[in-house]
Amino acid sequence: MKRSVTLRGETFVFSDLRELMARANEPKAGDRLAGIAASSERERVAAKMALAEVPLHSFLDEPLIEDDVTGLIVSSLDHQAFAAIRSLTVGELRELVLTSSFASEWERGLKGALTPEMVASAARIMSARDLMTAAAPLRAVTKCRNTMGGRGVLGVRVQPNHPTDDIAGVLLSALDGLLFGCGDAVIGVNPAGDSIENVVALEHALHDLISAVGVPTQSCVLAHFTTQLEALERGAPVDLLFQSIGGTEATNAGFGVTLQGLAEGLEAVLASHVGRDGFIGDNVMYFETGQGTALSVDGHGGIDQLTCEARAYGVARAFDPFLVNSVVGFIGPEYLANEREIMRAGLEDHFMGKLLGLPMGIDICYTNHVEANQDTTDQLLILLATAGCNFVMGVPGSDDVMLNYQSTSYHDAAGVRELVGACPAPEFEEWLEQTGIYEGGKLSELAATGPDSLLAFTNSVKELGL
């Protein structure tokens, strides 16, 4: 359906919703690369004006693409709850999510009444402060071996990657993270090698570490989900099943992923937990996403990268995950060119994920050839912590020596918790107090004494081979 707007004597015509949404998006290198971005700021403003007048039911009447992701989104929509808002426009949805009463309405059922396309449309007519204000009161609480997402909780994934998957190196980095109070979200390793044997070894090592120190958290080895399932069949203790996902069927095919395969993986991991101790909930999936991933595998189908990202959240929502995070800035300047685009994408992704009911975290990061620096990550970290982000990354020294990109460090996460008055997951914080790493809700002197504290802590896990 065509839509047109006349702005200062110039008429802009948009052939369909897909084109309208792409033109209304904030500047993104990926959209420019795909040839779908607005050609001028005036066209962008005109598109935003037209998009604000689109009724929400149009996103069901005019699907952007016909594929299995669209089918999943439509079938999982709470149509009864949607009936109450179907005639609202995108602009009216923006106004609704910014009201003080919205969080209560959202909790009572509106979070199931929105499709990713609706949420993505609202995001592109919101300011940075709007995105933060709307997301902050929305909480998505999940349980695996601890409880994530409660009000005031800022979780941290410990990411102890190693360029050769050296077990001692991985565990030493993980212990370093624990001493900073990090690791409540997950101790998650990206393996340098994707062999079954390597994944099995890493799964056992992380499990043994968690058992040895008695920390209430979960581990994950971020290999392809099929590799993790093969490791599970060989006896590996899989706490969380990880997979990168996209917002179109073609993108997921490029990742070697099917919706049926994810469903079968979920059931396999849940079944494996029946015979293991320590689990307090059934949220066992961990998904990563990121603006630009669909374009990177030529699977976007003409849809802009913000909308593709939101649709990936539609996939994630169907599997009731424990964690979801956008790796904002990871795939480079071809998709997010600079600090401005990275910061905007991080706030958009967090808002969209939260509005769709996800336990949303952000890997606040950049590659070494993009126009950004550690001030970028500092600023976005503070903004997201203020906006109620579920979790962020903890990377030793901010520099991932295996993936070769820059993220947030253990000390960054600890510092921003203190700055905004956030805390770890409750079970994890209790363990921190018991071990002396925390004292009165803050890092203790024991944790601040550097190598001596690390040496003292590792004495309890000598049997792991450190």
Where are these regions (language model features)?
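Anaerobic metallocofactor- and corrinoid-dependent redox/one-carbon enzyme cores
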Residues: 1-171, 179, 184-466
